[in-house]
């Protein structure tokens, strides 16, 4: 989904979980069926989850078992924190709308602007990560712009006490070209 303004996006990946040590697992490490269940398909869904008490942001996930039509055991409707110190997640989708056969993206758009998901050839993902612990000296206030999002001001990233949290931050991004597109 596309988060408006500087709100985070969410993204899901449908897949047959790989067999690791005789067990298929979801994004939280929970088993998905048995090794003999070659037909299981899940959607690992990722987004930002904020702890209501500490106000700490994390990358979270949960898994929908498409084959069984329910949340995978150990997962649930709420995102479960997976990686602490992730303040924001933004996603863009590379499409080729030139009508050619290059199979290379001609532009990147947000989820709301994808008219045909079979046209998506690549995914561009960016996260804003923080140092988890406060640093000294306090970092200079600045704006962070992740892909197409509105600027996210460091002064707006508050700690549990309601004050700016004095953490170092860095934007990381990558582009993933999808191999299973035709």
Language model: regions and residue ranges:
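Low-complexity, S/T/G/P-rich flexible repeat/linker segments used as non-globular hinges
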Residues: 163-182
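N-terminal pilin/flagellin-like segments and related low-complexity appendage regions
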Residues: 1-126, 132-168
